Amino acid sequence: LPPRYFHPKSLNFPAEPGRCLPNLYEFKRNYLTSLKSENGARGTVGMPLALGMYELLPLWHAVFTRLGFNVKVSPMSTRRIYEKGQFSIPSDTACYPAKIMHGHIETLITDGVDAIFYPCLTYNMDEKMTDNHYNCPVVAYYSELLNGNVEELKRVKFLYPYLNINSKKELAKELYTYLGKFYNGITKSEVKAAVEYGLTRYAEYMNAVREEGARALKFARVKNKRI
């Protein structure tokens, strides 16, 4: 069957038969959904696949897996997920990606996770290509709003530390200090190793995305397609 693409009005149109264009969105979705986690002795940590978690999932998934947690990722966004969390959205002025985060949180709680992780990040990863790398304030601090508006979060540990992901040393220190408040027995050395592992997995993910992007550009040039 030909691949399918979504119209902005949510209508589903099949692609023209025989046209197999590179699809980086599909590539990234497949990459993220392929991340697996084994049953961990320290419990299950849920990660909502929305806002800033979408691009940083390979990092956090690897960190918590290495620390001995089972990582449960919420499904790809759907209308049903949005509807599940719509009653805890405090403002209509928030962007849709922020609004749907409520549904992802509710879904993870329903799935029975022990904790949910969505950190506050003033800065995104510095890719050395722009003047600054500030996060949008909504992305950076939406955990605070979730904590104040999603009543069901009282049923789980909601982990939302303020972290610096651009310093390996600082990230390990901050995570160790924060997680130690909730989990006994976590050592500095294992957090340091987990951060190292997570940053390596994140770099692999970014390299894979860049390689796929280069492949798509090459395809467009060879086939004389618009770029």
State the predicted function of each range.
Residues 1-227:
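An N-terminal assembly and electron-transfer interface module characteristic of large anaerobic redox
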